[in-house]
Amino acid sequence: MRAARLHGVRDLRVEELPDPAPAPGELLVRIDACGVCPTDVRKYLLGATAGYPLNPGHEWVGHVEALGGGVEGWEIGQRLYGDTYAGYAELAALPVEPGPWSHGPLLLPEDLPLERAIFVEPFADCLHAVIDQARIEPGQRLVVVGGGQMGLQLVLAGVLEGAEVELVEPHDERRGLGLELGAGEAVSDLSDVWGKADAVILSIGDGALVERCVELAAPGARVVLFAGFGDAPRAELDLNRLHYDEISVVGSEWIGAPPNQRRVHYGVALDALVSGRAALERLVTARCGLDGLEDAFADVQAFRGLKTMLVP
């Protein structure tokens, strides 16, 4: 099979590898598509803690080709979602039991469009940020800063939770998408936001924006740091403001969510995608093969387009 694997910082190689054989407790899956995630690009640029070689794709859809020994409840030909680091390849061996880096396979209906199906994991991630970390309640005001592919999913997650959502995003087209997804307002700069918010989610890895997000927070509000900050993870904050107004600054990282939360949010995300309440395929702006993955990473770095779907 062909696969794209990282061998070090900025060292991505498309390789011919032996087809994997499913071990006991595993499924052999032929991968139909995989979403390109900004975290994959961070691993490419800054290094991977999981070791090398690494196939960082983790938003993938495929069909079962073979069953390993002892596997029950799965059949050849079934369609599934996988979130292990294996998605940038033609084939993957997927454990059926959840592990530290995987929720386990999730059965998908055949009629769910491929461009929508790849969003199960990232949309669940956004639900975790909105529900568990921002703790937004119906009718509360949520400001999402940054309208990239994840920021727009955060907008929709907030809308589905009943929040009054405002998007801050400089690009006209992305602001328009935010309004289409249900944001009540979309402005181009933080200075255009009036009043205070019950929660602010920062979806841009720019430490200079953290203090400005805190300034927007109402007493008792939560500021959620959704993006990673790369090699510049520093910010200055008015600690008296945090103290006297009881403002919480929290992170949101899907891998850090407890397994029970992840199970719940996977189910909610899949239900929203299947029902059409989360018609996120409009965020897919490019497609590529394995040989085009490095160009797709460059597009993410340059903020070109939104979501790229890799078809191996």
Segments predicted by a language model, with ranges:
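Glycine-rich beta-strand-centered segment in the early N-terminal region that forms part
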Residues: 18-35, 45-87, 109
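NAD(P)H dinucleotide-binding glycine-rich loop of Rossmann-like/cofactor-binding domains
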Residues: 82-145
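Glycine-rich cofactor phosphate-binding loops and adjacent beta1-alpha1 units
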Residues: 134-136, 176, 181-248
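N-terminal Rossmann-fold NAD(P) dinucleotide-binding loop
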Residues: 151-152
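Conserved S-adenosyl-L-methionine
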Residues: 160-164, 219
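Conserved acidic E/D residue at the C-terminus of a beta-strand in Rossmann-like folds
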Residues: 169
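C-terminal substrate-binding/catalytic core of Rossmann-like NAD(P)-dependent dehydrogenases/reductases
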Residues: 233-284
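C-terminal hydrophobic helical "lid"/dimerization subdomain
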Residues: 263-312
